[in-house]
Structure formats: structure tokens, C-alpha cells
Amino acid sequence: MGNDKEKYSKLRNIIPEMRRVKHIYFVGIGGAGMGGIAEVLVNEGYRLSGSDIAENAVTQRLASLGAKIHLGHKEEQVHGADVVVVSTAIHADNPELLEAQALRIPVVRRAEMLAELMRYRHGVAVAGTHGKTTTTSLIASVYGQAERDPTFVIGGLLNSAGTNARLGNSRYLIAEADESDASFLHLQPMVSVITNIEADHMDTYEGDFERLKSTFIDFLHNLPFYGIAVMCIDDPVVRELLPSVGRKIVTYGFSEDADVQALNFVQDGYRSRFTLRRTGVEDVEVMVNLPGEHNVLNALAAIAVASEDEIEDEAIIQALADFEGIGRRFEQLGCFDTDRGEVVLVDDYGHHPSEVAATIKAAKLGWPEKRLVMIYQPHRYSRTRDLYEDFVEVLSQVDCLLLLDVYSAGEAAIPGADSRALCRSIRLRGQLDPIFVADQEQLLTLLPDVLQEGDLLLTQGAGNIGALARQLAQNRLGFESTNNDSNRG
């Protein structure tokens, strides 16, 4: 066992040629995906440096581990690097990228570096429009509980580990597979998970949904012939693709024909309970420490992967029950005793209509007595335009809605695809009178007039609203009450 640990703990032991590489430079190092890979590499002993436009929790953690972080992009900062890793957010005219190319330093995308980490390991890659981060986190937690000591790279903070990446001492590598730029085609895992497929990031696929579906099939065919495709049969598009996949398939879902099926779903506040049914195995009662049917599906994916790897049910059930959650995935930031009574604050990353709908459904199912107040920040003008009517439909389902300006993510504004337009369209439906908040700083003075006793306040979106949610928590939602509050999560 000791030899295995030595073999798999260092990339240079798996690929001897990697010993030529001493210094790795990351352009756009502050992103969760980039930072996760960087953390694994710095823990492997590589000299690591990188740049981003601003400091954040990811860059601070990497600096604490010994990485050199530069704020801003300057061409001289790549000097001396043996390889440069670039984020998908980096434009072709970036000075560091241009300098690396001029100096003939190898330049690779994030997914290519992840593929090298995965090359000779037992890779588990989780793909899909929604649920990747939670599913990857659940799989990593199950493997950790089973003492498989995995390496993992996750797009969100795994609360139990205090990080989104970890270098393990075994042959297992569990990671998210990003379809947003089709770079997941670089990966060659042993197990691939498909959670669902919807129209998102369609600019990558030139607006062609058939091309998107075909790319997912290509991703599955990167599996070796002895690999396993774990697929959510509840998703109609995934179900449609099943006959086109020439690999062993294990399906999961609530559907009766699923190989790994959930029955008797009950949500008890933040927790979900269900009966697990698998072919040829006795039914088992399972509790997962996450709310909502969508999270039961994520748990089923983890169960399917672990069961195929012969992990004992005891470890699976314990890991799901003890799961401590992920940052910004229905994360409870506090329960505040205000001068108007108790208000619960929850923060969630979902930014696609289906994700927002799943979050709203879980909130209403777990806390049916509470009024649901949502602060929503749309993410990207293009997504708002492409899914406009879906956003109008789903955002109309809350009891009170505050809309922030669109978080552009570098995009130019698109007329008619902004928050003011959404407000007007939602108001015209006659169900809700949303409040447009032009300046985020207004929230601390606005919320005390909006919130009522017993409210569930949900901050929702993928932009900078997560930081805003924490600011609201620190400032007690704008209430000046001196009553004690309790943080529950």
C-alpha cells in the first residue's frame, strides 16, 4: 500500500517526463476551477505562480500554501515558467498569454492540465448543465468516508474539507468536467457522470443543441471500453442519448426503470429522506443532509458511482448523512432575530432557470410556512436573453422579489435583456410586483422595510451576490437590533 501512495501522490511519479517541469504559471488563477488544480499542483511540490485581476478567497488560500500571486496581468510575470495554464475567461490579447506564445512556453487550457492529473489515475468526471459541484462533492465525501483517500477538484468549497481541492494518496481523482467550452473532451476518465443536459453556453455550440448533445456523447466515448457511464434517466435529453452510448451504462433517478432508484422521497427541513432501490440488492433507507429532489438525484449519482466501485453501503449512507454541504449551494448563512422576528438567510449559486426553480421548490417544500423573499442577480446578458421567458416564469414563483442589475461577466449589455426589462415582464403577469435595486448598497436600508417575521431570505445567482450575501449577514440584514442571533448551517 505504501508503494501505491508514493506512486499516485506525485504527478512526476506517474509521468516521469513531468520532472522537466518545475514552474507552472496560471493566468486567471482566482477562479474556482483554476484554483483547485493549482492547489493540487502546489501540494505536489511544483513552484507555482499566477495572476488575476483581484484578490479573493482562492488567491489568498493559494498564497498561504506558497504560491506567488500577482494582481493584474503583465508580460514579464510569465518569465521563467515551464508551462502556462490559461482560464477560459482569458482573452486572446492577454499580455501574459501573448508573451508566453512569443517565448514558446507551452500554453494549455485548464482542462488539459486536469487531464494530465487524471491520465493514469482512476478518474471520475462529473458533467452536466446542473448539479456538477454538488455531485462531485458527494462522490468525494463518500470516497473519503470509505478511506479511499481521493484527490478531488471541485468548483465550490467543500465545507468538511475547508477547500475545493485536495491531493490524496490514492489512485482516485474526482473532478468536475466543464462543458461550457467543450474542454471536457480533453478528459479520459474511468467513470463519467451525466447529471442532465439543457441549453446553456450555447455560444460554444453556435446555437446548435444537437451539437451540444453530440459533444456529450463524444465525452462519454472518451471512456475506455471497460469504463462506466453513470447517467440520470429522469432527464429527457439524457434518456434520449442512451441508445447512442457504446459503453456500460448505469442509470439513476426516480424513474421505475432506473438501475439506482429513489422512492418514498420526504423532505424534512434541510434534510431529504428516501428509499434506495438497486437491482439485486435489498432496499436501504437513506438520509442526505441536503434539501430537495434535485439533491436526491445528486446523491443517487454518488451512490451509483460508489456501488460500482464496491464501496460498502455503510460508508455511503454515513457520508450522505454527515455531508456538511458546499459553499453557495443552498448554504444557510444565519438565522437572525430582528426587531420584526426571525429571518433565515440562505445563499445559492443557481443561475439557470431550472436551477432557480429547483431551489425555490426545495425552499417551499422544506419551509412551507415561510414567506420566500428572493434577491436575484441575473448572470450574463446572453443567458438572460436566451432564457428570458423561462426566467420570467420561475422568478414569478417567489413571494417577494428584489432584482439586482445583471452581472455581465465581461459581456456587453443587450437591449431588453436586463433586470429592468425582467421587472416589467414579471409585473405584467400580475402575480408579483418586483423591486428593482439599482445599487446593491441600497439593500441594507431597503430590507428592514421588506422583511417580515418568519421570512426565508434567499440570495440567488452566480455573480458577486455571494459576497453581498455575506455582507448582509455581517450587517444583520440592515436591522439595528441588538438581540442575539444564531448561525445555523
From Swiss-Prot:
**Keyword Nucleotide-binding in record:** yes
> Per its record, what are the GO molecular function terms?
ATP binding; UDP-N-acetylmuramate-L-alanine ligase activity
- Main location as per UniProt: cytoplasm
- Annotated keywords: ATP-binding, Cell cycle, Cell division, Cell shape, Cell wall biogenesis/degradation, Cytoplasm, Ligase, Nucleotide-binding, Peptidoglycan synthesis
Q: Which GO terms describe its cellular component?
A: cytoplasm
For this protein, the Enzyme Commission number is 6.3.2.8
Q: In which pathway does it act?
A: Cell wall biogenesis; peptidoglycan biosynthesis
Pfam families, sorted: Mur_ligase, Mur_ligase_C, Mur_ligase_M
List residues binding ATP: G128, T129, H130, G131, K132, T133, T134
Give the UniProt subcellular location, in the record's own words: Cytoplasm
Top enzyme category? ligase
What biological-process terms (Gene Ontology) are attached? cell division; cell wall organization; peptidoglycan biosynthetic process; regulation of cell shape
InterPro entries linked: Mur-like_cat_sf, Mur_ligase_C, Mur_ligase_C_dom_sf, Mur_ligase_cen, Mur_ligase_N, MurCDEF_pg_biosynth, UDP-N-AcMur_Ala_ligase_MurC
Record has Cytoplasm as a keyword: yes
The entry assigns this protein to a family as follows: Belongs to the MurCDEF family.
**HAMAP family listed in its UniProt record:** MurC (MF_00046)
UniProt name for this protein:
UDP-N-acetylmuramate--L-alanine ligase
What organism is listed for this UniProt entry? Shewanella woodyi (strain ATCC 51908 / MS32)
